């Protein structure tokens, strides 16, 4: 029996909550003991049912992952890999549940429609003397403070567009963020959509723009705090399209797989990625401005658990104050949710252990070679099991 895992923890959390005790109120040793007791209860129930069905097995001495002997052998094997040099420390973005404070596998995620804010944001271009701004859009405003780059495609044509007239505040019922004279760099195919969103009533295309020639950009919050006063490089990326958005992709390598891949494939180090979100899904970094410290991305408790937290509204407000918000709106997206808590998940870069399959170990052979040899030396019933394992390895 596999007696470990989040499903067990989740059930035990429910039991504690029924007694008005949150997970944070329960000491770790008490929580683990409760999980062990819960798992053992169901092992005993299932073993009794198997016996009633006439199934033979070592019911009095079963293999349990939660046996201390089993846990010790796992730790021993982990240490052997570390001593053999096949263990590597790294980081990459994974699906993370702020409610459960844990990583989730794809199998633990379900997708639901939900309404989210969408914003169009301007990045300064120091290399241009005309004051032009490059525009991105995102449905995750909370990731803007973690922005470290902007991605573009070498297959997309881009241009400089000058705003001539904008709908008035009287017409709109609110002051527009765009203004006559604004110069914006956009994908040609998407310019009309972006300028419509910005309530621009007339514009003209001025010239072609090659993003690769622009150099670094200025973070849209740079004027507000030194934390954001870093260069924002432009990276060529295969994931950038002109199907939607602006033709440019705001790149926060800590919070997206494509973002991460674009960052490291450009020769930059994973260790330079900015990690500003804590395990409970709130901003946490010693150098972040005070206005952002502790703001939650998703509410993790109470009746509004799973709803939007304070991070998105505050980031949008700061962008408006900086003069770099071009437009905003609401859209519906299909988003990942935890199948247990039913709350949205985020993508978050976390430190992880990686085991090399091809680095030679103590016997001079790689883990892949040793595993394939062990599979070959094992008799399988049915034999098809060998093929399945071999293909996986």
Where are these regions (language model features)?
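Carboxylate/His-rich catalytic cores and anion/metal-binding grooves
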Residues: 1-6, 158-160, 172-220
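N-terminal, positively charged nucleic-acid-binding surface of large information/translation enzymes
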Residues: 1-171, 252-257, 262-290, 312, ...
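A short, polar/proline- and glycine-enriched secondary-structure boundary/capping micro-motif
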Residues: 146-148, 172-174, 195-198, 296-297, ...
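Short, flexible, solvent-exposed loop/turn segments with mixed acidic/basic and small polar residues
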Residues: 122, 173-176, 235-242
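Short, mixed charged/polar active-site loops
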Residues: 131-134, 171-174, 181-183, 229-231
């Amino acid at each position: 029996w596999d007696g470990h895992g989040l499903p067990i923890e989740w059930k035990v959390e429910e039991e504690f909550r029924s007694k008005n005790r949150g997970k944070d109120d329960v000491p770790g040793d008490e929580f683990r003991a409760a999980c062990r007791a819960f798992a053992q209860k169901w092992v005993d129930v299932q073993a009794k049912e198997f016996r009633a069905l006439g199934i033979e097995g070592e019911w009095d001495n079963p293999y349990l992952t939660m046996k201390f002997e089993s846990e010790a052998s796992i730790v021993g094997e982990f240490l052997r890999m570390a001593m053999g040099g096949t263990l590597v420390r790294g980081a990459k973005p994974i699906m993370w549940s702020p409610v459960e404070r844990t990583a989730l596998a794809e199998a633990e995620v379900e997708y639901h429609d939900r309404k989210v804010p969408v914003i169009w944001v301007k990045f300064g271009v120091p290399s241009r003397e005309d004051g032009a701004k490059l525009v991105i859009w995102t449905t995750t405003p909370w990731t803007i403070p973690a922005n470290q780059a902007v991605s573009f495609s070498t297959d997309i044509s881009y241009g400089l567009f000058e705003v001539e007239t904008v709908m008035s505040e009287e017409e709109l019922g609110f002051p527009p963020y765009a203004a006559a004279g604004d110069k914006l760099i956009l994908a040609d195919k998407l310019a009309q959509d972006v300028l419509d969103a910005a309530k621009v009533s007339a514009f003209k295309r001025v010239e072609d723009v090659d993003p690769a020639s622009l150099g670094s950009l200025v973070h849209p919050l740079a004027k507000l705090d030194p934390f954001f006063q870093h260069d924002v490089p432009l990276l060529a990326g295969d994931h950038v399209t002109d199907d939607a958005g602006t033709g440019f992709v705001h790149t926060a390598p800590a919070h997206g797989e494509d973002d991460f891949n674009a960052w490291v494939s450009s020769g930059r180090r994973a260790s330079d990625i900015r990690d500003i979100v804590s395990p409970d899904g709130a901003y946490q970094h010693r150098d972040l401005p005070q206005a952002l410290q502790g703001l939650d991305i998703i509410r993790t408790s109470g009746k509004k658990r799973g709803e939007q937290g304070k991070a998105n509204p505050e980031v949008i407000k700061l962008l408006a104050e900086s003069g770099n918000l071009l437009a905003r709106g609401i859209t519906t997206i299909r988003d990942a949710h935890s199948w247990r808590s039913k709350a949205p998940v985020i993508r978050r870069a976390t430190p992880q252990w990686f085991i090399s399959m091809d680095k030679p170990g103590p016997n001079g052979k790689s883990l892949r070679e040793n595993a394939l040899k062990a599979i070959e030396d094992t008799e399988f019933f049915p034999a098809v099991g060998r093929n399945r394992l071999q293909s996986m390895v």
